[in-house]
């Protein structure tokens, strides 16, 4: 829901569906999305029309899902969520938070710090921020007025290598969704794609990717 809220907040017309809507679940999330102006459909293909410009799906959505099938029948482009986030990140001055753990917390902290500093950042996160939830929002996205964007960069599906942030922050590296060697390669690409790279040297694996030991 984070990217949907972000794009709606920038003035785009956004709609979407979820199988949980069919089952009568996720009612609170659905209400909050609709309060933002996002139209929510049942997962029955009714939200896909010839007027739809683009369909975005997460990596968990199969090609057999009716919305994907209908979009392809109508010749509507279909892209993955991670690819769209990479496009959004490329359009802003982006700070990408990476690491095996602590991403959501650090993303939230940095967003709040920048907000209090008057920098008016935007955010796309994997978890809700208390400061935004208190305002009645889902809390995982916000559109600020500046060029700054803070994102949580996920390594579990390898999508982190698509980002080319102004600032990349690496919190830690531990064996989790992938083997350690594969993670090291993924985060090395993340480092190489970042204009400025900040590493937490208290983690034995992440510090191996440090280029300048003095400044990290």
Where do the model's predicted regions map?
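ATP-dependent carboxylate-amine ligase
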Residues: 1-40, 51-55, 72-76, 211-214
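Phosphate-binding loop of NTP-binding sites
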Residues: 6-10, 47-50, 59-215
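Structural motif corresponding to alpha-helix initiation and N-cap regions
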Residues: 27, 42-45, 184
């Amino acid at each position: 829901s984070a990217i949907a809220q972000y794009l709606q907040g920038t003035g785009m017309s956004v709609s979407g569906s979820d199988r949980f809507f069919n089952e009568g679940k996720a009612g609170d999330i659905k209400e909050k999305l609709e309060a933002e102006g996002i139209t929510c459909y049942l997962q029955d293909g009714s939200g896909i029309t010839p007027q739809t410009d683009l369909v975005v799906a997460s990596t968990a959505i199969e090609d057999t899902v009716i919305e994907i099938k209908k979009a392809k029948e109508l010749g509507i482009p279909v892209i993955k969520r991670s690819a769209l986030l990479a496009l959004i990140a490329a359009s802003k001055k982006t700070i990408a938070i990476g690491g095996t753990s602590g991403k959501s917390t650090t993303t939230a902290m940095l967003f709040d710090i920048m907000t209090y500093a008057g920098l008016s950042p935007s955010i796309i996160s994997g978890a809700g921020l208390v400061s935004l939830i208190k305002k009645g929002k889902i809390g995982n996205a916000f559109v600020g007025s500046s060029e700054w964007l803070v994102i949580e960069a996920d390594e579990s599906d390898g999508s982190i290598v698509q980002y080319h942030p102004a600032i990349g922050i690496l919190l830690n590296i531990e064996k989790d969704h992938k083997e350690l060697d594969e993670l090291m390669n993924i985060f090395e690409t993340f480092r190489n794609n970042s204009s400025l790279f900040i590493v937490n040297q208290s983690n034995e694996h992440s510090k191996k990717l440090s280029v300048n030991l003095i400044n990290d």
